[in-house]
Amino acid sequence: MKLLYCLLLFLISFTVFSQTKILSWNLENFGQSKSEKTILYIANLLRDYDLIAIQEVVAGYGGAQAVAKLADELNRKGAKWDYVISDPTSSSAYKTERYAFIWKTNKLKKIGRPWLEKKYHLEIDREPFYCTFQYENKQFTVVNFHAITKSKQPETEIKYFKFLPDQYPTLNLIFAGDFNCPQSHTVFNPLKKIGYTSTLINQKTSLKQECKNENCLASEFDNIYFNTSKFNTIQSGYIPFYKNFNSLKEARTISDHIPVWFEFSLN
């Protein structure tokens, strides 16, 4: 009986270890405007995840510096973290941004060099940023993306995502980011037809200017999409961090979006 208990405990521990938790967050103008106190708050919120995909990193030096500060703060929390930052996207000077990934090195290994999408960089204003990771002996590639605003019709660029699984047939793709578009939009149907699904359904993720009748979220923009034939969902969700603040105005100094997350294992 004791041997059976030990074996069960080992199997549970092994299963937990073999899972990966990814979090995606539009950190709104992530750069010099974020104070040390803000970066410390963000680090405390992210410390229990394995991989962080960040959108809206400022294209200038301040953006890269903020990511480095966040990684440094995470390294003070007990685990070793590394990070990578994209080149500025090829969009106009006003719209150009960077993306970033931060990950726990004892859990994940970065494979090869990350890259910005090349084939559709003219069709997609802020072309997505790819990075491949390995945990145990299996690999997956996160496609980090920030779409144009809703008024500019983000579906006109999201429509090119249906070509990406065929463009990268050997990669296990996860699409993560701020799509400025709900998962129910028909632009996602081609991906759904080949097995992709969203981690969140009908979940608003952007903050209003102020809460009305305890309703503080505005639009269903942020999500994570994955192929159900390649990934097993353990659990998924979002972090309503704004509830830790006295007002949305105060919460919005962190970001005008809430983070979304996905815990999974690979088939």
Please name every model-derived segment:
Residues 27-32, 57-61, 88-93, 107-109, ...:
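Solvent-exposed loop/turn segments at secondary-structure junctions
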Residues 2, 16-99, 155, 159, ...:
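N-terminal, active-site-proximal structural segment of metallo-dependent hydrolase catalytic domains
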Residues 2-9:
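Sec-dependent signal peptide recognition
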Residues 155-176:
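His/acidic metal-ligating clusters that form di-metal
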Residues 21-24, 50-56, 83-85, 100-101, ...:
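Structural recognition of the beta-strand scaffold that forms the well-ordered cores
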Residues 60, 166-172, 181-267:
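Metal-dependent phosphoester-hydrolase catalytic domains
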Residues 18-22, 105-109, 123-145, 267:
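Beta-strand-turn-beta hairpins that frame and shape the catalytic cleft
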Residues 9-17:
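Hydrophobic h-region of N-terminal signal peptides that target proteins for export
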